[in-house]
């Protein structure tokens, strides 16, 4: 009975982590991301510092991020991959900032073998490091995971483009969501925010 209870407890923890990762991860503001990034740089955990930059700027899931080698990203203008979850082919443009950051971190990390995987931690360990780091810098959000980076990047693009519906639809396509309702929940767009759109009709014709 003890073995069964322990096994059940393990399953519960695994399911809880999966729920946080896939459904309800909190997004982080750019200020919170900067604080978290500085925390890992101070600890000289450059793998985690780069993960924050990479995940935020590419909107990729950890299952895809964890497959990249240095050779596949350094001095590249595009990333080519088949998404592990969806099986869909993706072409992701590497912006000038990310391109420069990859070179910078490669040097800081003492030029690893080009065939080395960049992000070597397991998903579980990575999530624990993110959660511990967040607490260490005073971020009080409880549902932080690798998925928070993807969600934060998507939310940032949406807000930077004045919550444009055109940009929203493009972000939804990038995220490969089944429908726009999923994307609205994902970006944390509330019913109140949707209702506020109608305030634009407060004009006299």
Positions of PLM-derived features:
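C-terminal secondary-structure termini that scaffold catalytic or DNA-interacting sites
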Residues: 1-27, 202-205
């Amino acid at each position: 009975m003890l073995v069964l209870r322990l096994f059940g407890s393990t399953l519960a923890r695994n399911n809880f982590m999966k729920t946080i990762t896939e459904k309800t991860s909190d997004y982080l503001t750019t200020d919170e991301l900067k604080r978290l990034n500085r925390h890992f740089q101070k600890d000289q955990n450059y793998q985690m510092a780069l993960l924050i930059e990479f995940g935020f700027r590419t909107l990729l899931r950890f299952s895809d991020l964890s497959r990249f080698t240095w050779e596949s990203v350094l001095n590249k203008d595009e990333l080519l991959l088949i998404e592990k979850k969806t099986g869909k082919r993706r072409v992701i443009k590497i912006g000038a900032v990310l391109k420069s950051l990859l070179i910078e971190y490669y040097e800081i990390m003492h030029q690893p073998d080009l065939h080395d995987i960049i992000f070597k931690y397991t998903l579980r360990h990575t999530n624990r490091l993110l959660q511990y780091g967040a607490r260490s810098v005073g971020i009080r959000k409880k549902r932080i995971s690798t998925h928070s980076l993807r969600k934060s990047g998507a939310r940032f693009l949406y807000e930077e483009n004045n919550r444009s519906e055109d940009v929203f639809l493009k972000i939804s396509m990038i995220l490969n969501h089944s429908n726009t309702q999923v994307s609205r929940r994902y970006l944390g767009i509330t019913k109140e925010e949707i209702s506020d759109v109608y305030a634009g009709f407060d004009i006299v014709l």
